[in-house]
From Swiss-Prot:
Oligomer status and interactors: Part of the 30S ribosomal subunit. Forms a tight heterodimer with protein bS6.
Residue intervals passing through the bilayer: none
Family statement drawn from the similarity comment of this UniProt entry: Belongs to the bacterial ribosomal protein bS18 family.
Listed GO MF terms: small ribosomal subunit rRNA binding; structural constituent of ribosome
Keyword ATP-binding: no
GO cellular component terms listed in the entry, alphabetical order: cytosolic small ribosomal subunit
Gene3D superfamilies, A to Z: Ribosomal protein S18 (4.10.640.10)
Origin species: Roseiflexus sp. (strain RS-1)
Job of this protein: Binds as a heterodimer with protein bS6 to the central domain of the 16S rRNA, where it helps stabilize the platform of the 30S subunit.
Name under which the protein is recorded: Small ribosomal subunit protein bS18A
Encoding gene (name): rpsR1
Biological-process GO terms, alphabetical: translation
Length: 88
């Protein structure tokens, strides 16, 4: 539904638009900064989608490349241990 002023009604949870963190800080995703990259990984070690991170498409692609490079350099794990594996 579009109103006369051209705005759209927000549906679902939250009404605030996420801002691309890298663009806001004026930096690029870097594979040598694993602490910053870990924030974009889920609990199982998978890369979070754009709708969860709020990154632009361009920065999401650069983030993916940086995470994959960090994984190959052994700075980040490929997968996180699951809860059942931790008991052993």
């Amino acid at each position: 539904m579009t109103y006369q002023d051209g705005s759209r009604r927000m549906r679902g949870r939250g009404g605030r638009k996420k801002v691309c963190e890298f663009s806001r800080l004026g930096i690029l995703p870097d594979y040598k900064d694993p602490e910053r990259l870990k924030r974009f990984l889920g609990p199982t070690g998978k890369i979070l989608p754009r709708r969860r991170t709020g990154l632009s498409a361009k920065m999401q692609r650069k983030l993916t490349i940086a995470i994959k490079r960090a994984r190959h350099m052994a700075l980040l794990p490929f997968v996180e241990r699951s809860i059942t594996d931790r008991r052993r």
